[in-house]
Amino acid sequence: MGEWLDQVYCEDTLQGITRLPDQSIDLIIADPPYGLGKDYGNDSDKLEAEAYLAWTQRWVDAVLPKLKPNGSFYIFLTWRYSPEIFVMLKQRMMMVNEIIWDRRVPSMGGSTRRFSSVHDTIGFFAKSKDYHFDLDAVRIPYDAETKKARSRSIFVGAKWLELGYNPKDVWSVSRLHREHRERADHPTQKPLEIIERMVKASCPANGVVLDPFMGSGTTAVAARRCNRHFVGFEMNPDYCRLIEQRLAALETSETA
């Protein structure tokens, strides 16, 4: 393993990605700016549609060679651009799932000319049909009542009742609010529950996860909690310091 392992570089992915050897990454989790004008401390979210899609293609083509032949790729998207980006990605990879993250936010106010948007779109892609996927690691336990009822069914084996069921492609996980303990100072921080599900399912033990847009560092935290390695890039110096703080706090809690 190289010196780049378990590092977050405070630089643009397009500049720093050459640090990584080709076919060295098991899983890529990308949460790029959505092109909606949010403030990330730079101009990364203020591109017009055509420029945004061209930029997306550039960074995708830069990171995909780093993925192993059996590697996987998850990308968070807004509905505004997911159709175009899915088409672009399907020209390069095999699409496994479209996942809907239901952020469990109340539908109040907003536009009176369209339905309220309360979800993010997640694309799950793989480099080949032999992609790594550990379903047992992310099964959801049945509750006692369901387990009792299904134990009488000839269609459900005892093993599957104990292991739990396959998560569906709609993930209802609350977005992070100020009262959540894991909340950090970042406008689009993703819940650990979601990132850890991706890591456990799609990265083998001791494998490597790449995050091209580290943000608050949730991917690094999830990888460490799941006994995987990580590497990533983040342009904002304030967020780089935040990532250091979160990883240090995790290390302290593990040794306490």
Question: Which residues are covered by each model-predicted region?
Answer:
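Short, conserved SAM-binding/catalytic segment
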Residues: 1-4, 244-256
